[in-house]
Amino acid sequence: MNPRLRSAMQAARSANMPKDNIERAIDKSSIINQSNFENLRYEGFGPEKVAFIVETLTDNKNRTASNIRTIFQKSGGSLGTQGSASHNFSQLGVIKIDKNEISDEDILELAIDAGANECNSYKEFHEIQCSINDIYNVKKELEKKISNFISTSIEWIPLNSVEISDKKKEELINFFETLEEDDDVQNIYSNVKFSN
């Protein structure tokens, strides 16, 4: 089984998705694999010059490019070329673990021993970051002590964040929502940080 499929199935099981839904999604993905679908990445700057990376899966790249460009332009942003925004990010392996699974201190020690670069604990989960080349080796080490993973993925993590005031927060949220409404959009990454 390929690593992306294994990761997706594990995330679905962690979210208590019914087995029938998982099987239906796998069947649909095999139809997609037989079609002319492409993974495309768009980069640009949205409201307040926040950097964005938008990952898509499409059977019509002209339609998708037009839709994404229009969304950026209507928000006062601009769609850039490959590399125009991604230099603000680092692509890393990200492993999320249920907070109830292990204590903050123990996960930190375990993550370091497994070869992770960083480990952060949040209210509901622990997040471990590592090189994309090491993600499955790190996870394999973690699996020796942990059974309840929320997700394993490759993500664009911002190197520096742009802080946005509450006045501009709604504008950015609307931009995110408009991007998410596009059927071809799979993932959205930004370097925004909302001020308190």
Label each region the model flagged.
Residues 91-196:
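Positively charged, low-complexity, intrinsically disordered RNA-binding extensions
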Residues 1-4, 39-47, 79-89, 147-159:
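Flexible hinge/switch segments at interdomain interfaces of large molecular machines
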Residues 33-34, 72-79, 99-104, 108-109:
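A general structural motif
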Residues 1-56:
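Translation machinery proteins
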Residues 16-21, 61-64, 103:
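Helix N-cap / loop-to-helix initiation motif
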Residues 8, 68, 107:
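Aromatic/hydrophobic pocket-lining residues that form π-stacking "cages" and hydrophobic walls in ligand
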Residues 43-57, 62-90:
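RNA pseudouridine synthases
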Residues 9, 13, 26-30, 72, ...:
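Structural signal for hydrophobic packing residues in well-ordered secondary-structure cores
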